[in-house]
Curated annotation (Swiss-Prot):
It is a single-pass membrane protein. It comes from the Viruses. It comes from Variola virus (isolate Human/India/Ind3/1967) (VARV). It is found in: Membrane. This is Protein OPG074. The gene is OPG074. Signal peptide: none annotated. Induction: Expressed in the early phase of the viral replicative cycle.
Length: 666
């Protein structure tokens, strides 16, 4: 199968014959080229057609002709801003900044605004400071004034770390405000203004309320050196041993002489105060042994010889091994990470690098088309090679050579690979090509049924089903029947354009998105599935619908490390649809094995899973064969996190059947 359908290859041939000038080909071919992303920068004459085909095409036009409203729509439909969209956005930055708070929010998330831009927005009363602070408080690094009510309202909606940052930028912060916030919202008053508090009892209350937050460092100096205060803090520290509070220990070390600390705490003083103390392990009391074991990481770092002797002693006396501990300290706060980014990581051997290499080689010597084909063949699954080639800075003759090769690419449907002794037909590239051929038909179908209630839907697939109600309303997720009932309902919802991209607490980890969007293929499944026990895998029945989003709202461009690798939004969303079904399959099987610890009749259960998915999609008379070797592969999947290649192969065969059924080519 050719990667591109015949009419797309014909349109590309016409473009090549016109030396890549899209204005010189017929309007019929122009529309095809736009639909399949077979273009580079675009002329003004195609603006309306290109925008109607895909709003993100706005980035390929000269910035001076672009409508600001189209840029807004493009920003709303993207999760990363590449150099092209960034350029047109910055060109129209002033207009975008006054286009409303939602647009400003997008610009902040994409890092399109500077600190001076934000200061201007606040000073000119275009946007309220509180609105910007709720988006990302760390963006504001200049002094501002807020009322007490505004501060309290903010604290309710921003993380603790952002509140502490807010303290540092407020002109009118006072002691009463931070004490009120501490009392009502349990946010530590870690700010210099706390030093104005001279009430010793209140200081003790705050320090003991937040022992991990180093409130002690902001306490009034007179209070810090009060004998009563010192004794109270020491008693608090002693009462919580073997748990250690490093900040309080540092404080005690600063107000009590070393000799007294060593005399009272002995071997504990090594971990608590980093003091030197020598002793034999066989003289330790039971209390000291417990303390040392709990805090062994401190001894590993500060007194390694003693730590080793202690381990040997415990092994000898109790036949028990004390492992190396990391001694992780609790990190107080982290800045929120934005899902959106303007940073696009570049592969070590990106297509652009390879094109540049080919271009340079052509200038110095004759390069055969066979050599070029071999060099770029690893990119045959990328549906946007044509666009990236045309956008590159290489010579037009090199571009034409590459485009002629890409035009005639075929999916390697007959390539065989050995998976644990089983010869498995590699079908993933064929499926991706089929999706590229028929994605508009599939997308049209998904959007035509996305507003229908599945229990009463009379679409062509539902009308042939034996069971049209929700199967999982009353089910036991500890049984195979319960898992299959939920899978049936999830898949039926997906077929009606509503999916859960976050079923296991991770997004877009299936084989199609990994292959197509250049995600990290080496991620171990057991790392991906770490939250499966508390994820949406526990949801069933009517509650499923609350976890779903329309396929039209899935942020397809979030998937791509390089946004240029996505042909168009509809194509990406159809890939997400089929990829999500594969994720449902793998997650259901993994849950049964890893969470329920049920390894009985694995092959038979896999067979049931695959046929449940097909049945839910209205495919009632197809059969998938499953080899017995699936059992060994799935055991390795759970034990070692190895990607289940054969299961992926089976799942891809299933979605290929579903694709053909939706497209009417089965």
């Amino acid at each position: 199968m050719f990667m591109y359908p015949e009419f797309a290859r014909k349109a590309l041939s016409k473009l090549i014959s016109k030396k890549l000038n899209i204005e010189k080909v017929s309007s019929k071919h122009q529309l095809v080229l736009l639909d399949y992303g077979l273009h580079g920068l675009l002329p003004k004459s195609l603006y309306l057609e290109a925008i109607n085909s895909d709003i993100l095409n706005v980035r390929f036009f000269p910035p001076e002709i672009i409508n600001v409203t189209d840029i807004v729509k493009a920003l709303q439909n993207s999760c990363r801003v590449d150099e092209y969209l960034k350029a047109v956005s910055l060109y129209h930055k002033n207009s975008l900044m006054v286009s409303g708070p939602n647009v400003v929010k997008l610009m902040i998330e994409y890092n399109l605004l500077t600190h001076s831009d934000l200061e201007w927005l606040i000073n000119e009363n275009v946007i309220k400071a509180t609105y910007l602070l709720k988006i990302n408080a760390y963006m504001i690094n200049f002094k501002i004034d807020l009322t007490v009510d505004e501060i309290i309202d903010l604290v309710k909606d921003i993380p603790v770390g952002a509140t502490l940052h807010l303290y540092n930028i407020l002109n009118n912060l006072d002691l009463n405000i931070i004490l009120r916030i501490s009392d009502e919202y349990n946010i530590p008053p870690v700010h210099d203004i706390l030093s104005k508090l001279t009430d010793e009892e209140m200081c003790i209350k705050l320090v003991t309320k937040y022992p991990m937050e180093n409130v002690i460092n902001f306490i009034n100096q007179d209070v810090r050196y009060s004998p009563t205060f010192i004794k109270t803090i020491k008693d608090f520290v002693n009462a919580h041993l073997p748990t250690m509070y490093d900040g309080l220990n540092d404080y005690l070390h600063s107000v009590i002489v070393d000799k007294d600390l060593i005399e009272e705490y002995k071997i504990k003083s090594v971990a608590m105060f980093n003091l030197e103390y020598k002793t034999d392990v066989d003289t330790l009391t039971l209390d000291e042994q417990i303390f040392v074991e709990v805090n062994i990481s401190y001894y590993d770092f500060r007194y390694r010889q003693f730590a080793n002797e202690f381990r040997d002693y415990i092994m000898l006396k109790e036949s028990r091994q004390i492992t190396m501990q990391t001694g992780d300290k609790i990190r107080r706060f982290r800045r929120p990470m934005s899902l959106r980014s303007t940073i696009i990581k570049k592969d070590t051997d990106s297509l652009e690098d390879i094109l540049s290499h080919i271009d340079n080689a052509r200038k110095n010597s004759k390069v055969s088309i066979e050599d070029v084909d071999r060099i770029i063949s690893s990119f045959r699954l990328n549906p946007c090679v044509v666009r990236r080639t045309m956008l590159s800075n290489i010579d037009i003759k090199t571009k034409i050579m590459v485009l002629k090769i890409a035009k005639d690419w075929k999916s390697c449907a007959l390539t065989l690979s050995a998976i644990k002794g089983i010869m498995v037909t590699d079908t993933i590239n064929t499926v991706l090509s089929k999706i590229l051929h028929h994605h508009r038909n599939v997308f049209k179908y998904l959007t035509s049924v996305d507003n229908k209630e599945i229990t009463v839907c009379n679409c062509s697939r539902c009308v042939s089903l034996f069971y049209r109600e929700l199967k999982s309303i009353r089910c036991d997720l500890n049984t195979d029947d319960g898992l299959l009932a939920r899978l049936y309902d999830l898949t039926r919802y997906a077929l009606h354009g509503r999916i859960n991209q976050n079923l296991i607490g991770q997004r877009c980890w299936g084989p199609l998105t990994e292959m197509l969007f250049n995600e990290d293929k080496k991620r171990k499944l057991n790392n991906l599935m770490v939250y499966i026990k508390i994820s949406d895998m526990l949801v069933y029945g009517h509650s499923i619908e609350k976890t779903l989003i329309p396929i039209t709202e899935s942020l397809s461009f979030k998937l791509s490390v390089d946004t240029m690798s996505v042909s168009n939004d509809q194509y990406a969303k159809v890939v997400i649809f089929f990829n999500t079904i594969i994720e449902y399959i793998v997650a259901t099987i993994y849950y049964r094995l890893a969470v329920l610890n049920n390894y009985v009749a694995i092959r038979h259960f896999v067979l049931k899973v695959l046929h449940t998915v097909m049945e839910a999609c209205g495919v009632l008379f197809s059969h998938i064969k499953v080899n017995d070797k699936i059992e060994h592969e799935l055991e390795e999947m759970v034990d070692k996190g190895i990607v289940p290649s054969y299961l992926h192969h089976l799942s891809i065969n299933v979605i290929s059947i579903i694709l053909d059924d939706i497209n009417g080519t089965r």
